[in-house]
Amino acid sequence: MANSGAKKRKTQNEKELFKVRLIMAAGTIPYILYRVVYHSETFGGWLWFAYLSLNALNMFAYYIITSMCKLTYDNNGELIDGGSDLNQGGMTEYYFDIIYVCCIIQGLGLISDKCLYLILVIPAFAIFKIWKTFIGPYLASRNQQQQQPQEEKSKRREKMEKKQEKQKVKYVK
């Protein structure tokens, strides 16, 4: 039997998914009506590619979001788990951002075809986050590891030099 938290999460996720579907429809339907239907003679080539890639990104992000909030039922059909909380941070925020950016780009695409180049913001941001999160710290730690043995050698050399200086003093009997 589901607790009240799972039921609340289920209704909250359903509301959030409904809002996302509305946003996707608000971005896609005007674009189809204006660019594909009304200006069909100028809609071709790379515009089809841009439109399909925007929708592919939208559908990919929406699929991931819906799979995250998948409900779990027991054998009796009662709700066990309401799925993940869609208001949590982490990757969920990025999937929502992908949907929002794609819809904004489609809206701007009604004004000018050149606005569709803004789709490059998504992979640019992904590369930036990967660099900042994984590659940059890896390279920084690697450089520090290479510098540490050199520093240790210099400390050893300093100790050896100090010992040699001390041994230069001769005792007279």
Curated annotation (Swiss-Prot):
The chain crosses the membrane at residues 17-39, 45-65, 91-111. It is a multi-pass membrane protein. The keyword Membrane applies. One of its GO terms (biological process) is vacuolar protein processing. InterPro entries: SND2/TMEM208. Coiled coil: none annotated. Residues 150-173 have a biased composition (Basic and acidic residues). Signal peptide: none annotated. Its main location: endoplasmic reticulum. One of its GO terms (cellular component) is intracellular membrane-bounded organelle. It is found in: Endoplasmic reticulum membrane. The keyword Endoplasmic reticulum applies. Residues 142-173 are annotated as: Disordered. Keywords: Endoplasmic reticulum, Membrane, Transmembrane, Transmembrane helix. Belongs to the TMEM208 family. This is Transmembrane protein 208 homolog.
